[in-house]
Amino acid sequence: MTASARERSFDPAAPEHVADPHPLFHRMREEAPVHRQVGRATGRAFWYLTRYPDVQRALLDPDVGRQLDRLPADLAAPHRRWEIDALAMVRRNVFHLDPPDHTRLRRLIAPAFGARTVASLERRVEHVVGGLLDCMAARAAAGAEVDVIEELALPLPILVMAELFGFPVEDRARFRAWSDEMLAGRNGVRTLRAGMRFVEYISEKIDERHARPEAGDDLLSRLVEEERDGGISREELVSSVFQLMFAGDETTVNLIGIGVLELLRHPDQLARLRERPRLIGPAVEETLRFNGPVGHARPLYALSDVRVGEAVIPRGEIVLPVLLAANRDPAVFPRPDVFDIGRDPNRHLGFGHGIHFCLGAALARVQARTAIGSLVNRFPEMSLAVDPADLEWTSDLFLRGVRRLPLLIPR
């Protein structure tokens, strides 16, 4: 196969792979585990890594980083001209920085997502989920179709993250609208407009905390205190809040949606979970492995020529570790295409690996376990209202999920 033919054949961004990219990733692991693809719109070279060891190694390699300014200007220039989406406005945060700045910021923020804080939020998550399920039950009793995404997966993380940062609950509709705009209009005017409004909102809330430092004991108040003491800059503060709200929201929404979908697509595993509710934790982990909400890690840059297997990735080109592909590598996972909620061990990379392991993983897990487990318990006779093949998936391989998940719940 010629290089150009292979590029056409192995293009994970092609529309036909959106709903189910796994057959393509199986072929790539076997035939082109380190695959160079030139973006059709941007002309930039992306290197897709699909084998578990290569993905894991790339996420640990100090010669592969996230900060574009660590490259010479001539190598960085082709990438900068495409950084026009809303996320480009706010890159001074743990998601986009390398050590030592990454280490400093993560040390400030990580305690808010640690085991103690997450445990203290668990009862609140249960309360919110209970209220959302009550609303779903009322709609079902009236004969209406219910949508897991719209009525459970979307509102839950918005409410939880707003409470964590001390944002007014009544502003949740604004967060939702901004998030939808940023996802719908990537690299466009809508994305920039929504991102700017979100940034302005965060800046206003920071100013309010400075004016009334005694007002709250939430995460934003604690970070504002760090800004006052010089531990974090204003740009880093705004950027960190922006990314935590946006990334935490979308990842959790999609994890809940995909988790429910996979259980309904695998009735034997759903029955197993109903018989043994304590398997809800492993069920969430298996969702992260089998069909996780994050397709690939955030783009990395080769800071020097990087050898991966027999290939050499030139300095300045983009490295994309494909988490979905690594998580079905048969060299690591027996029967990788089987959805098994009792899988043990399960060393998936669904939340990443190394210094950029997902900061909010513990909180996302609590929300997913509570939402999915409570839904299964509350509505034992629920079923999909449409054929799974008719579900619409988001078009982005990075943050992926179904747009709607309609259920039938017998009255």
Listing of model-derived features with the role each one plays in the protein:
Residues 1-411:
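Cytochrome P450
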